[in-house]
């Protein structure tokens, strides 16, 4: 940051610019223009780093730090990485959230010498800036999830923000207006790798929450970067439009969001931006809102540690292509809220579930397809290889075979919604033939290796490769011709490094060289050497053939790529079709494999699940040859809240999570783990399940819990589903019960939404007497003497205790601790004045397990306090008698 605050003169002085070599001056000029980046400076076969960049990169990458002489009195730190291993090192730098500028050589050393003489410095410049949100390399990004760059624009009224996000690797670009209160939730849905934000918001609560709560990278830009006039011009220029209405009906802040994204891509990609479609405008309310903590609690796309194993995505993902997995990731991140669209997806899933033989064939064929979205992006950005074109060719071929599977099974009787999906699978014969006729099957990854274009496609390519592969034959052919012309049978064509190719004859045959086309080059003691125009031409062709053929192939390849780019819209439709097939065949596969059922959707406020199961827990139990205990859940307008009491380890939290997960799975268009499911569409899901101390943010468990609960109560609507577990447990019992009680009342009376509320506060169960839409449920247990068995069944009724001591014993607490706890529990129960009041009778949060004094100590203290206020000489007989009766009650 210190360098960013220095002006050019100060920078030159710091690095002794005036006494630096020409090459180091070139480096410094480029570095000064990219102070916010690590600069990788191409020198021959290495990318070198200098000064502070070298010290930092050496530590991050674990590579040796060396020196490159001195600049004035200062030693120049240096480290480097081989150019062919660049991606491996970039991975580490990007993972650490560094911005990397790639500076390449724009000419060869030979070209530099021809341009400026022996001391000329090779021309270099930054060809690309790599940031977490602008990666396209397969090795640097997760193949099964999007890699979004987002721009967030907050208008002056602050009521609605605009968000534009783009996945450069697939050319997806979307813009959406987001209510100010939902910004963090929307960002949690997208998980962008990088967010563009105005410098004016650097110290805002929003920026603080994005960075600390969501842990997303923010790249700040000056406020003018988001200026409306500038952004509108950028959009019009990029899409070659005359009127911004060509984008659609968009707000000013949406224009700023789109324009700033395009500008950032232009800056980082150095004008080499891929062919992006017109941004898709979506409605924020089209997708279920799931806030960050709920996504974490439910472990939807990642587990609680940020990995994939044990997440809902890992359980449901049996797609056979990485691009299909990416679409499933998007589905799970963004469940639908429109019944018609949900049912459309469910109908597709049902079709494939009813045609499992077709599913089996399609899944095998899909394995032969490629990620043509990312292939196309690399092609449009001039970073592709022949293998990308071959991938498109093979995918086109496989697509037509897949369509044939449908036609063979159904002919012309396919449902319309399936016909629409497979329409792009007809292929594009023109595109297929173009690639088939031009690109060799063994095309290398690197264009500079040559051998990418089929010889028969272009006569000059064939000729040059013939020279490369058969140069000696051409020389021998010319030799035979000259022998015949001169009659010298001993004539040879030889080569040395001084004069190149030459005709060699013995001195005694010199009189036979009569044709003036033979030009004398050299005479030795016994030999005379000649050349001809033909031989010079052949030599030139042989020497330059490799360079010429690579140059020609690059030109031809660029032309082929331009023709492929013209088919970009079709290729994206094809990719969408194939990705959709993979996901819906996956839904059919898991429905069959795990016995899932098609859910029914209704406009009513219902959530009627029969024999529901938690898909992740069920799969884990199956690996241990155990069975999952299913449970019903029947929420409705008349029974909106289930208050669930019962022991720990009995399955309350699993039950809460499984119902939220069933709603999510249903609304992405999949069958669900249940015997039947009837669901009123859920617009938002909120959960508060457990909380860890957030010491970094200075928040205790209780504060974190209250913040989450506050957000839930503020953002929920009548159509939301709330799951709450142990609200109020992080404070004293009195406070905890009071908070839980009032939260339940608020949900019942104000929000009137569906809610599952698990608690250890059994005092709350009396609320069913005066809250008509609240019903008590508990976990069934089986007692046998001193032992209990958790049956994991949810049944109607209320628990009268939590069996905490049994759970503590199972956890392995010392027997002495358990026995002492039993004594204390008995004392608590003796002080209880009635069912449901044993906890409220004492503020247990302030009691010590090991230093609890007998009840007499408490009585003695009260007596001391009472007697200290009494003057016996002033008591009347009646007052003395009343005092005796009062003291009698204390014993």
Curated annotation (Swiss-Prot):
PROSITE patterns: DNA_MISMATCH_REPAIR_2. ATP binds at residues 646-653. Keywords: ATP-binding, DNA damage, DNA repair, DNA-binding, Nucleotide-binding. Transmembrane segments: none annotated. GO terms for biological process: mismatch repair. SMART domains: MUTSac, MUTSd. GO terms for molecular function: ATP binding; ATP-dependent DNA damage sensor activity; damaged DNA binding; mismatched DNA binding. The keyword Transmembrane helix does not apply. InterPro entries: DNA_mismatch_repair_MutS, DNA_mismatch_repair_MutS-lik_N, DNA_mismatch_repair_MutS/MSH, DNA_mismatch_repair_MutS_C, DNA_mismatch_repair_MutS_clamp, DNA_mismatch_repair_MutS_core, DNA_mismatch_repair_MutS_N, DNA_mismatch_repair_MutS_sf. It holds the Pfam family MutS_I. Gene3D superfamilies: 1.10.1420.10, 6.10.140.430, DNA repair protein MutS, domain I, MutS, connector domain, P-loop containing nucleotide triphosphate hydrolases. This protein is involved in the repair of mismatches in DNA. It is possible that it carries out the mismatch recognition step. This protein has a weak ATPase activity. Belongs to the DNA mismatch repair MutS family. This is DNA mismatch repair protein MutS. The gene is mutS.
